[in-house]
């Protein structure tokens, strides 16, 4: 049984010039995840459920657990003295860590994706993305360090809190998964070099918004629902409402996750920096694809911290089909 710490150190030996800082950074995220896991498991017993009464910069109601998870991860990252600053879905602006001006890395995160599911005991997750800063070490980080295309990510991953808690991450050399053993307090290697199955037969989308979808997405959904034995259609519809949980299932079983633009959200709803980029990095490393309907997600150059994007991610042939339908049936 190999632990996450042992696995990271083992991989570090493959790179003679590695300093161990990235290893320590991922260890900090691991610690934050263990704390969040502990408190999610007793969420119904303590007062951390429901809305906080505070709105974020996008005007969305923040849940108590969103803020709690944000503070725990922020504290874990700051304590290591490696991260120069963070950007979070729950923070209006970047957070600069004083006294860590020499830190090489910045972290972007969605501390608790799908937190509205907590009240009904459905899987939620943490998403993280790591970049090397581009401003000179020894100075405070700026927004420039965070507004990098996803192709510049050093590492990315997620933690899914479900029937078991699992940490899945990549540093650009495959996707690896570790399952948390609460009796030992360690994450143990459960899957190495994960890939999407060759073919996917599941689509994940909130079809309640169907009337607001672009014409190309509507046509693709009808394609998914048509009967065709040669392509094993109709496909199965599975939607949890937590990006991490939906992505994780499709990674294991094969499928596509779709969150298109709508009339009410013409730029899409998911955040490019905190959700789309890290999941796109993982998808490509697992042999899949991620797109905004026209462009590769990892090629997009962000302009603002909380920029949104349409998002299509999963098996490459399914994402390719979605792009084709969007090209063939453009909205007027």
Swiss-Prot record:
- Associated pathway: Carbohydrate biosynthesis; gluconeogenesis
InterPro entries per the UniProt record, alphabetical? FBPase_C_dom, FBPase_class-1, FBPase_N, FBPtase, Fructose_bisphosphatase_AS
Q: How is the cofactor bound?
A: Binds 2 magnesium ions per subunit.
Which Gene Ontology terms cover its molecular function?
Answer: fructose 1,6-bisphosphate 1-phosphatase activity; magnesium ion binding
Superkingdom as given in the UniProt entry: Bacteria
UniProt catalytic activity: beta-D-fructose 1,6-bisphosphate + H2O = beta-D-fructose 6-phosphate + phosphate
Top-level EC class, please? Answer: hydrolase
User: What quaternary structure, including any partners, is listed in this protein's UniProt entry?
Assistant: Homotetramer.
SUPFAM superfamilies given for it? Carbohydrate phosphatase
Q: Which cofactor does it need?
A: Mg(2+)
Tell me the keywords, alphabetical order: Carbohydrate metabolism, Cytoplasm, Hydrolase, Magnesium, Metal-binding
User: According to its UniProt record, which protein family does this protein belong to?
Assistant: Belongs to the FBPase class 1 family.
Q: Which residues bind Mg(2+) 2?
A: 110, 113, 275
Q: Which Pfam families match?
A: FBPase (PF00316), FBPase_C (PF18913)
Q: What Gene3D superfamilies does the record point to?
A: 3.40.190.80, Fructose-1,6-Bisphosphatase, subunit A, domain 1
The protein, known as: Fructose-1,6-bisphosphatase class 1
Which Cys-Cys disulfides exist here?
Answer: none
Localization, per the record, is: Cytoplasm
Cite the binding residues for substrate. 113-116, 206, 239, 257-259, 269
- The EC number on file is 3.1.3.11
Which Gene Ontology cellular component terms are annotated?
Answer: cytosol
Q: Which GO terms describe its biological process?
A: fructose 1,6-bisphosphate metabolic process; fructose 6-phosphate metabolic process; fructose metabolic process; gluconeogenesis; sucrose biosynthetic process
**Residues that coordinate or bind Mg(2+) 1:** 89, 110, 112
């Amino acid at each position: 049984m190999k632990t996450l710490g042992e696995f990271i150190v083992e991989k570090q030996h493959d790179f003679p010039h590695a300093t161990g800082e990235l290893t320590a950074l991922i260890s900090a995220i691991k610690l934050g995840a263990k704390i969040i896991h502990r408190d999610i498991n007793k969420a119904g017993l303590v007062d951390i459920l429901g809305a906080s009464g505070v709105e974020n910069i996008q005007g969305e109601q923040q849940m108590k657990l969103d803020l709690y998870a944000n503070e725990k991860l922020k504290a874990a990252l700051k304590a290591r003295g490696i991260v120069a600053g963070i950007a979070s879905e729950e923070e209006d602006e970047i957070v600069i860590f004083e006294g860590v001006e020499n830190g090489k890395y910045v972290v972007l995160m969605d501390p608790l994706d799908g937190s509205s599911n907590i009240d009904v005991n459905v899987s939620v997750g943490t998403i993280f993305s790591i970049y090397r800063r581009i401003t000179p070490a020894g100075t405070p980080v700026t927004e420039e360090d965070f507004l990098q295309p996803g192709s510049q990510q050093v590492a990315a991953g997620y933690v899914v809190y479900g029937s078991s808690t699992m940490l899945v991450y990549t540093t650009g050399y495959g996707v690896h998964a570790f399952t948390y053993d609460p009796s030992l307090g360690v994450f143990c290697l459960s899957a190495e070099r994960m890939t999407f199955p060759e073919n996917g037969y599941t689509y994940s989308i909130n079809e309640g918004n169907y009337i607001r979808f672009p014409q190309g997405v509507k046509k693709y959904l009808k394609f998914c629902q048509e009967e065709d034995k040669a392509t094993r259609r109709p496909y199965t519809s599975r939607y949890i409402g937590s990006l991490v949980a939906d992505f994780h299932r499709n990674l294991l079983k094969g499928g596509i996750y779709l969150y298109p633009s709508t009339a009410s959200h013409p730029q899409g709803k998911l955040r490019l920096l905190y959700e789309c980029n890290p999941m796109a990095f993982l998808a490509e490393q697992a042999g899949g694809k991620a797109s905004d309907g026209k462009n590769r997600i990892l090629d997009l150059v962000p302009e603002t911290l909380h920029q949104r994007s349409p998002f299509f991610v999963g098996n490459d042939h399914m994402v390719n089909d979605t792009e084709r339908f969007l090209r063939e049936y453009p909205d007027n």
